[in-house]
Regions:
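Hydrophobic alpha-helical segments
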Residues: 1-191
């Protein structure tokens, strides 16, 4: 059961309606979380600006790596909406569906390279229980300070977003289907 619902579009301030219109043009529909965030227009605007800054074209983190991290954090936080929309973005960024379907098994899958493994390990540590000194040293030896800030900010943002959506029980909106075409939850390994 959803804890909070959106309200009729006419009841949102003009700035929120403009943001929702832009989403409809980009995604073909309004994203359900935006109807919730839109209840607090200033927070919604700040959130949108932060996401835009973190997922910009000029980011020092490659687009596919950014998307891998956002999907994995979404899986860890059991956010159906985030897994759905971020997996669709990951596929649009050229990552094969087979790899997306194996994301929860990244440690043993041969489909992930060293950079991806480090980013996913870092994302899991931040999301689950914190980063130890050994992992900090590996991150520091691989990425520049600016890259560390960018990827850490993205992971923190995705934790905020996915925990918000999971807590409010925001459902998937059907953006991404896994290879076999079923609705299997890609957050857990195959049995």
């Amino acid at each position: 059961m959803t804890l909070v619902s959106g309200k009729p579009l006419s009841r949102y301030p003009w700035l929120v309606r403009l943001m929702l219109w832009k989403q409809r043009r980009s995604y073909g529909r309004v994203l359900d979380p935006s109807l919730l965030w839109g209840r607090s227009p200033r927070v919604f605007a700040g959130l949108a600006l932060l996401y835009g800054a973190l997922d910009r074209r000029s980011s020092p983190i490659p687009p596919s790596l950014r998307s891998l991290v956002t999907v994995r954090v979404s899986q860890l936080n059991h956010c159906a909406f985030c897994i759905d929309v971020n997996s669709a973005t990951l596929a649009r960024r050229g990552v094969p569906m087979e790899k997306i379907a194996q994301l929860s098994e990244w440690r043993t899958s041969p489909l992930f390279d060293a950079d991806e493994r480090l980013a996913l390990e870092y994302a899991e540590a931040i999301t689950r229980n914190g980063v130890d000194d050994e992992l900090r040293a590996r991150v520091k030896s691989r990425w520049s300070d600016d890259e560390i800030i960018e990827i850490t900010g993205l992971i923190a943002f995705q934790n905020l977003s996915s925990k918000f959506n999971a807590t409010l029980d925001v459902p998937a909106q059907g953006f991404c289907r896994i290879p076999d075409g079923t609705a299997r939850d890609i957050s857990t390994p195959r049995q």
